[in-house]
């Protein structure tokens, strides 16, 4: 069944057909701009108007019409070239009758090319005086209304291409995201790390505690998982002698969607041979401080009306932070029964596979996590919840592991990596026991990883850091789906015409 066109769409289709009648391709041909709008603005924005007029600077630009005004034999329009806009002056006497008629029939959203000279208007706005007006692409749908269209965030997430056209904040977020990725890559490259790629399809579930997506490999006739972490393949590379490696890529976890979770998300994992948790803590701090300095020129910035200060990273053990909030000291040798009793008293839900370590983690989640606003390294996680981390020598119930918390959320996870293959096998067996008790996030036994460890992995420090949350933090964005170009949304496969899609910019086709 054909989609019913709105009144505005019908008019645009008619204009498309009119272009065809005069042998103009509504969807254009190759057009080579001499400048981007950004380049023109950077070079000539501050130029003297008289000098500009005398210089007769010729430019050739392309962009989308986002504003159009004027009647009679002359008019103005604003061209948008991604994140930059510029005014153009179109006059019948300069472009000719045929081109001027095409200009008059253009709609907001159409893509055009203009050739002409730069000048400044009486209000000192840098403008292109058009000598040629070239139609490049007909937009058959109108742009959303500035107010209603931008209020419906879910609709914009589903139609990110429209969001990018009309929402400057969205464009700025993704420009900043690109910069963040660039700076992080540069940081690790400059530290001597080697960027690598490891498989997205993995035969064994491991490297994190999470529910996986499962798919079937027809050629091999076996099930594979979309990776939930890159940890184990990267540590195999450490075994192979790549002493400094990192990978930036997507992970997949078949879990819930909320303001800080998306099933498909980006991380960096980095591994450094002959290092430990403290070295990785220092590396993480240095990376984030350099990142803030490059973006803001300082170590302080605002997130959701909270002042965040990267000049100082606090450090506290998990059990000490719980004691501070609850008075309970989990360094005491509590039995499982005592821990269960404490959990019941504090209304903490306990699953069948829970041990003392899981209960400690649950206390931390309930009483501490949301209070950690400024950057805080929380270290000393229980052994039972850290199957890939080395035991702490002073207290083997805990591990040499830390998580970084900012604004009440986890941003990074790091260990002194367990490199004892015999102990690692015991940990994997414990994970299998947890899985039998209902922990569907427990790791599988990865025999190939154990085989690699048997060849000898040097003492190693490892880091995993979520990049989407980091972009949220550094762009002051409240929802993770607003820092991912194409996030998962409900009913994404169903094409529906939202009411806002038919509300167009004021005087869209009459300006």
Swiss-Prot record:
Cellular component GO terms held in the UniProt record: cytosol
Lineage: superkingdom: Bacteria
GO MF term list: ATP binding; lysine-tRNA ligase activity; magnesium ion binding; tRNA binding
Annotated InterPro entries: Aa-tRNA-synt_II, aa-tRNA-synth_II, aa-tRNA-synth_II/BPL/LPL, Lys-tRNA-ligase_II, Lys-tRNA-ligase_II_N, Lys-tRNA-synth_II_C, NA-bd_OB-fold, NA-bd_OB_tRNA
Binding site for Mg(2+) 2: 410
First-listed, main subcellular location of the protein, grouped into a coarse class: cytoplasm
Gene Ontology annotations of biological process type: lysyl-tRNA aminoacylation
Compartments (UniProt record): Cytoplasm
Family: Belongs to the class-II aminoacyl-tRNA synthetase family.
Name the record gives this protein: Lysine--tRNA ligase
